[in-house]
């Protein structure tokens, strides 16, 4: 895919030189037509990154490139043209309370100079797309949180942007409404071809919607990859913590103590991979090694059409036989010994 948004050595600082940079030498490429999630804890630099994409902030050094244009080299009038191609939705919806749903969606079209008949036609199209035709003349206070966010999405799409920025757009919604909004964003991406950048601190959002993800910490990208890559084999402590909030495939310290108290055999955790080699080794465990096994913890998940996870096994047999089986297991996948 062609790059749609690029950060090239971007640093952004606020205040004096003693203040840590909000972004610190950041390099990142977001491809055209993908859903890209950026996840990180508070203060990681996520919101600053978004404001650089739509040129509401300017980098202290480095360059931000959108559609092949270096934003740092553009004049304000040219930046206005770039911003016109970028829609944005927010955590708190940011709707005009005094305007109807129709009026909120029509507002950016009016600012852009669309004639009244074209505005009416476009708003009708967007209301149908987000499933709110019957709410056209309602006011924001008459809407649920999910409906407000649908209005926000429709408004952000009004001028046919090529990029949609979603800054914590579901963090104030309940799980069911969040799922509905994420499904709508998937439609926006699939049917309209819009590149979507999602800023979030919720790994469930990443799992549900993203093609790729970057983990941001202290203004730097510390890990990036497809959602499957990051979920199935996180490389950094921060990524592992985030993944652990939605997946409990491996036992924690309390789980290990409980397993040790209930099981006398050796306990190992085996990473599940898509190639099926672990299953082949385990199927030979009794016949080849005279070792019995029991699954005592773990789980398997599916992402992007592939399976991954971890199984924690109790291995029961003579020590030499168990050693031989563990050696075979290590040849098939990653093995961590939990308890001898």
Curated annotation (Swiss-Prot):
Record's keyword terms, sorted: Amino-acid transport, ATP-binding, Cell membrane, Membrane, Nucleotide-binding, Translocase, Transport
Lineage of the organism: Bacteria, Bacillati, Actinomycetota, Actinomycetes, Micrococcales
Gene Ontology terms for molecular function: ABC-type D-methionine transporter activity; ATP binding; ATP hydrolysis activity
Top EC class, one word: translocase
Protein family membership: Belongs to the ABC transporter superfamily. Methionine importer (TC 3.A.1.24) family.
Designated name of the protein: Methionine import ATP-binding protein MetN
One Pfam family in the UniProt entry: ABC_tran
Biological role stated in the UniProt entry: Part of the ABC transporter complex MetNIQ involved in methionine import. Responsible for energy coupling to the transport system.
Membrane topology of this protein: Peripheral membrane protein
Stretches assigned to the ABC transporter domain: 5-243
Taxonomic superkingdom: Bacteria
One GO term describing the cellular component: plasma membrane
Subcellular location: Cell membrane
Catalytic activity field: L-methionine(out) + ATP + H2O = L-methionine(in) + ADP + phosphate + H(+); D-methionine(out) + ATP + H2O = D-methionine(in) + ADP + phosphate + H(+)
Source organism per UniProt: Leifsonia xyli subsp. xyli (strain CTCB07)
This enzyme's EC code(s): 7.4.2.11
TM helices/strands, residue ranges: none
Description of how the protein assembles with itself and partners: The complex is composed of two ATP-binding proteins (MetN), two transmembrane proteins (MetI) and a solute-binding protein (MetQ).
Binding site for ATP: 40-47
């Amino acid at each position: 895919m062609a790059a749609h948004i690029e950060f090239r050595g971007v640093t952004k600082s606020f205040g004096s030189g003693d203040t840590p940079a909000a972004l610190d030498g950041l390099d990142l490429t977001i491809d055209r037509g993908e859903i890209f999630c950026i996840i990180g804890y508070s203060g990681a630099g996520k919101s600053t990154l978004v404001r650089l994409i739509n040129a509401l902030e300017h980098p202290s050094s480095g360059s931000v490139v959108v559609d092949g244009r270096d934003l740092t080299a553009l004049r304000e009038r040219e930046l206005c043209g770039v911003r016109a191609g970028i829609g944005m939705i927010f955590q708190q919806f940011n709707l005009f309370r005094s305007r109807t749903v129709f009026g909120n969606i029509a507002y950016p079209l009016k600012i852009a100079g669309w004639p009244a008949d074209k505005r009416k036609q476009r708003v009708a199209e967007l209301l149908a797309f987000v499933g709110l035709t019957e709410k056209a003349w309602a006011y924001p206070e008459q809407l649920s949180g999910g409906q407000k966010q649908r209005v926000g999405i429709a408004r952000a799409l009004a001028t046919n942007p090529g990029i949609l920025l979603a800054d914590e757009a579901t963090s104030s919604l309940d799980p069911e409404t969040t799922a509905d909004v994420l499904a709508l964003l998937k439609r926006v991406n699939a049917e309209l071809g819009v590149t979507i950048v999602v800023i979030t601190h919720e790994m469930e959002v990443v799992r549900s919607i993203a093609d790729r993800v970057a983990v941001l910490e202290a203004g730097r990208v510390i890990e990036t990859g497809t959602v499957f890559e990051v979920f199935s084999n996180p490389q950094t402590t921060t990524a592992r913590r985030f993944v652990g909030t939605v997946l409990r495939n491996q036992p924690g310290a309390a789980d290990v103590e409980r397993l040790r108290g209930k099981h006398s055999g050796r306990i190992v955790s085996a990473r599940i991979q898509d190639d099926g080699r672990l299953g082949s080794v385990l199927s030979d465990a009794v016949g080849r090694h005279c070792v019995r096994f029991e699954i005592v913890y773990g789980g398997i998940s599916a992402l992007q059409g592939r399976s991954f996870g971890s199984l924690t096994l109790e291995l029961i047999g003579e020590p030499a036989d168990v050693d031989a089986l563990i050696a075979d297991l290590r040849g098939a996948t990653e093995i961590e010994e939990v308890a001898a």
